[in-house]
């Protein structure tokens, strides 16, 4: 996993300062054809690239949205994860009670047709979940997507990630199985950016 940290200290969610005890992980995807992390994560740290519209989420916004991490492309095209909230911070991601219990991350979508990109972000997400399970004593059974959260009555009505992954032969069951396999093996290879 290629993990970096750029905490959204200018987002109202961070400023609210509410904490949670993580009981699960919720997987989201952005719903927009833009695989670049710089669209959501900013300002540029030298790896992200410049967001020409300056519409990243690390600033005051007219919407209450914030997740704990994003997975997508850096400026050089490699896939990475950016932590954007402390893992035990209450996010604004589910539109329901999962905000009080779940760590959340968004996977930046492309046009949903690039199997190579999907495989890279999928495996990055598996490694992130293995890492978070290790930190909080969770298992693969504690991982759901936004769509499953809606079915459980703890999230708003969204289709992510089940509108995308099945196009490439993947779903939440294959994802949980991949996390379980890695939890049973050695720890994932994690490159973590040093604290600044």
Each predicted region: which residue ranges?
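Catalytic nucleophile-His microenvironment captured as a short glycine-rich beta-strand/loop
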Residues: 66-73, 102-107, 133
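N-terminal catalytic cores of peptidoglycan-degrading enzymes
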Residues: 1-98, 162, 168
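Basic/polar, cationic surfaces and motifs that engage anionic cell-wall
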Residues: 2-7, 15-19, 101-103, 110-196
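A cross-domain feature marking catalytic cores of carbohydrate-active enzymes
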Residues: 29, 71, 107, 145-147
